[in-house]
C-alpha cells in the first residue's frame, strides 16, 4: 500500500491523554508498517482554551513515548486564511451559505426538536444589515452517506439526520468539523485513524469532502478506552495522562507495549518489541469493543522492562540530574540487580534503593527501629566482631560462616543475628539478602552503620 500518510491532530487544551497517546501510536505504527509518513498537527483554533503548556506536554509526551513525527509540526491557527478561502469557495458553489440567525435562537430550536425527538433542519433565509454571519454547510436532502470503516465495516446514515453545521464562525475562525477536512486534504492524509467518538463527525466530513471534490481518505475508528468498571475513562479511574505515568515511574517501552495491546492483539503475544509492533501492526486486528484499563498488566509489563534494562540505563533514568558520589553510584549499580526484581515502578525502585544512597545515621522503619532498640548490645558486639575480619576475607562465603560462628558464640538464633545486621545497615526489614548488601557496601561502611545506632 504505497504513499500512506497518517496524522495525529490533538487539541492543546490539556495534557496528552492515554487515549490520544494510543491514537498517535496506532497512526505511527500504521505509517511505519507501510513505509509511509506520520504527521503531527496541533489543532489550536480554540484560542481561549489552547495553551502553550498543553502544546509542550503533547510534544514531550510523544517524544517520551518514542512516537516521532515526520516534517514540521502544523499549527491549525496559522492556516485560518486557507480555511476562509475554502469556505468562500463552498458559498460560491452553493454548497454553503451565510446565516445571520442569533445562535441562542438556533440553540433553542435545536433543544425543542430534541425534546420532540426530531432532527432540527436549520435553513436560514434572513438577512440582517451589519450582522456578522456564520457560514453553514448546506447539507443535501435525503442523501445516503456511506463510510467503509476499517474497523466497524460498512456504515451508512441518511443526510436528513444531519443539520446544516457551522463551518465558519462569525469571527471567521473555522470549526473543527470543517478545518480538519481542509487540513487533511492539503497534507495529503490518506488514512485517518481516530477514536470512535468521531464517527458522527465523519459522516458530516464526508459530505464536505464530496462538496469540494476532494479525495476521501480511508477511515478507521478505534473503540474508546474504558476503566475497569466498563465506564468511560475518567480521573476517578486513576492516572489518565501520559505525564502521570511518566511521573509514576513507568518506562516508555512498557507504556508503548501496554497501549499497543489496548484493543489490538497479535495472537497470544504480550511482550512486543518496537520492531515487532511495526512489522505486525494492522487495522484488522483491532477489536470493536472498548478496551479496559488493567493496571496489573501495566505493572507486569513495567517490571519486565525494568528487569531487562541494564543497571546503567536504569540508574540514569532513576537519578535524572541529581548528583551522587561515585561510591554511591557503584553501590546502586551492584545492588540494582536484586532490587529491580521487587519493583514495578522506577519510583518504587528508587524508594527501595534509599539505603544505598543515605548516609548514617538515617531514619529507620518502625520495625527496624524496634529491632535496633531490642538488640543494641548485640549490634555493638557485631561491629567489633566484623572489624576483625580482614578485607580479603570480606566475601559471601566467609561472612556467612562468621555470622554462624557469632551466633554460636553468643547462643543466639541466627535469624536474630541477621535481623540485628539488617536493621542498622539498611534501616528496613524487607531488603534483599543482608550478606549480599554487606558485600556491596564493604567492610568500613557496614561497621560505620552499625556504630551509628
From Swiss-Prot:
Keywords: Aminoacyl-tRNA synthetase, ATP-binding, Cytoplasm, Ligase, Nucleotide-binding, Protein biosynthesis. It catalyses: tRNA(Glu) + L-glutamate + ATP = L-glutamyl-tRNA(Glu) + AMP + diphosphate. InterPro entries: aa-tRNA-synth_I_cd-bd, aa-tRNA-synth_I_codon-bd_sub2, aa-tRNA-synth_I_CS, aa_tRNA-synth_I_cd-bd_sf, Glu-tRNA-ligase_bac/mito, Glu/Gln-tRNA-synth, Glu/Gln-tRNA-synth_Ib_cat-dom, GluQ/Sye. Pfam families: Anticodon_2, tRNA-synt_1c. A motif ('HIGH' region) lies at residues 10-20. GO terms for cellular component: cytosol. It comes from the Bacteria. GO terms for molecular function: ATP binding; glutamate-tRNA ligase activity; tRNA binding; zinc ion binding. ATP binds at residue 235. Its EC number is 6.1.1.17. It is found in: Cytoplasm. Gene3D superfamilies: 1.10.10.350, HUPs. One of its GO terms (biological process) is glutamyl-tRNA aminoacylation. Belongs to the class-I aminoacyl-tRNA synthetase family. Glutamate--tRNA ligase type 1 subfamily. PANTHER family: GLUTAMATE--TRNA LIGASE, GLUTAMATE--TRNA LIGASE, MITOCHONDRIAL-RELATED. Monomer. Catalyzes the attachment of glutamate to tRNA(Glu) in a two-step reaction: glutamate is first activated by ATP to form Glu-AMP and then transferred to the acceptor end of tRNA(Glu). This is Glutamate--tRNA ligase 2. It comes from Wolbachia sp. subsp. Brugia malayi (strain TRS).
Amino acid at each position: 500500500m504505497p504513499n500512506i500518510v497518517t496524522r495525529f491532530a490533538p487539541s492543546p487544551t490539556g495534557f496528552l491523554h492515554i487515549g490520544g497517546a494510543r491514537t498517535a501510536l496506532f497512526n505511527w505504527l500504521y505509517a511505519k508498517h507501510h513505509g509511509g509518513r506520520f504527521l503531527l498537527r496541533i489543532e489550536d483554533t480554540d484560542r481561549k482554551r489552547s495553551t502553550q503548556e498543553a502544546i509542550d506536554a503533547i510534544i514531550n509526551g510523544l517524544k517520551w513515548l518514542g512516537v516521532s513525527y515526520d516534517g514540521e509540526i502544523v499549527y491549525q491557527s496559522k492556516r485560518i486564511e486557507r480555511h476562509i478561502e475554502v469556505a468562500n469557495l463552498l458559498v460560491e458553489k452553493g454548497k454553503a451559505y451565510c446565516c445571520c440567525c442569533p445562535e441562542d435562537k438556533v440553540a433553542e430550536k435545536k433543544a425543542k426538536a430534541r425534546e420532540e425527538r426530531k432532527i432540527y433542519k436549520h435553513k436560514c433565509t434572513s438577512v440582517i444589515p451589519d450582522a456578522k454571519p456564520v457560514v453553514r454547510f448546506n447539507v443535501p436532502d435525503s442523501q445516503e452517506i456511506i463510510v467503509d470503516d476499517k474497523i466497524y465495516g460498512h456504515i451508512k446514515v441518511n443526510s436528513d439526520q444531519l443539520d446544516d453545521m457551522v463551518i465558519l464562525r462569525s469571527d471567521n475562525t473555522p470549526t473543527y468539523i470543517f478545518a480538519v477536512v481542509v487540513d487533511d486534504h492539503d497534507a495529503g492524509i490518506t488514512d485517518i485513524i481516530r477514536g470512535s467518538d468521531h464517527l458522527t463527525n465523519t459522516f458530516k466530513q464526508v459530505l464536505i469532502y464530496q462538496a469540494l471534490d476532494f479525495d476521501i481518505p480511508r477511515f478507521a475508528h478505534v473503540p474508546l478506552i474504558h476503566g475497569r468498571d466498563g465506564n468511560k475513562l475518567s480521573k476517578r479511574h486513576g492516572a489518565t495522562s501520559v505525564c502521570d505515568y511518566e511521573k509514576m515511574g513507568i518506562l516508555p517501552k512498557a507504556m508503548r507495549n501496554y497501549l499497543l495491546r489496548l484493543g489490538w492483539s497479535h495472537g497470544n503475544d504480550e511482550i512486543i518489541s518496537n520492531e515487532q509492533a511495526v512489522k505486525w501492526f494492522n487495522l484488522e486486528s483491532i477489536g470493536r469493543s472498548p478496551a479496559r484499563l488493567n493496571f496489573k498488566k501495566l505493572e507486569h509489563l513495567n517490571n519486565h522492562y525494568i528487569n531487562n534494562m541494564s543497571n546503567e540505563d536504569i540508574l540514569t533514568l532513576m537519578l535524572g540530574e541529581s548528583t551522587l558520589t561515585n561510591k554511591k553510584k557503584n553501590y546502586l549499580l551492584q545492588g540494582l540487580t536484586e532490587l529491580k526484581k521487587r519493583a514495578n515502578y522506577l519510583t518504587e525502585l528508587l524508594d527501595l534503593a534509599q539505603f544505598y544512597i543515605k548516609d548514617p545515621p538515617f531514619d529507620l522503619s518502625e520495625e527496624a527501629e524496634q529491632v535496633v532498640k531490642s538488640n543494641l548490645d548485640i549490634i555493638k558486639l557485631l561491629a567489633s566482631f566484623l572489624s576483625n575480619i580482614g578485607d580479603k576475607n570480606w566475601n559471601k562465603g566467609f561472612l556467612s560462616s562468621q555470622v554462624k560462628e557469632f551466633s554460636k558464640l553468643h547462643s543466639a538464633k541466627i535469624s536474630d543475628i541477621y535481623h540485628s545486621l539488617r536493621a542498622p545497615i539498611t534501616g528496613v526489614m524487607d531488603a534483599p539478602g543482608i550478606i549480599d548488601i554487606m558485600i556491596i557496601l564493604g567492610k568500613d561502611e557496614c561497621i560505620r552503620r552499625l556504630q551509628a545506632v
